[in-house]
A protein has these predicted regions:
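Compact, glycine-rich, soluble single-domain proteins
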Residues: 4-91
Length: 91
């Protein structure tokens, strides 16, 4: 099973696609998301969001001003005030 992931900033879509895992820093600590994760809404802390693709590729984005992370039915949406790719490619 895979996750449908969308990472957006206030200005644009930063990345979207399928992944096997998402790791993000929240105000309560780091969270790792795999397929089948319980529905969750979390407040992001400034830091990195790491997306591990199904083919082994890794995408890393830096979130500067926080935002939120929504998980529901294997869909992960990361909405950040400011976000930019550090490594990996935009899709």
């Amino acid at each position: 099973m895979s996750l449908q992931v969308e990472l957006v900033s206030a200005e644009s879509k930063v990345w979207s696609g399928t992944a096997r895992m998402v790791i993000a820093k929240t105000i309560e600590g780091e969270i790792g998301v795999l397929a089948g994760h319980e529905p969750t809404l979390a407040v992001l802390a400034p830091g990195q969001v790491t997306i591990r693709g199904e083919g082994g590729e890794t995408v890393v984005a830096h979130v500067e001003d926080g935002g939120f992370l929504s998980i529901d039915h294997d869909r992960v949406t990361v909405v950040a005030d400011t976000a930019a790719l550090v490594s990996g490619s935009a899709r």
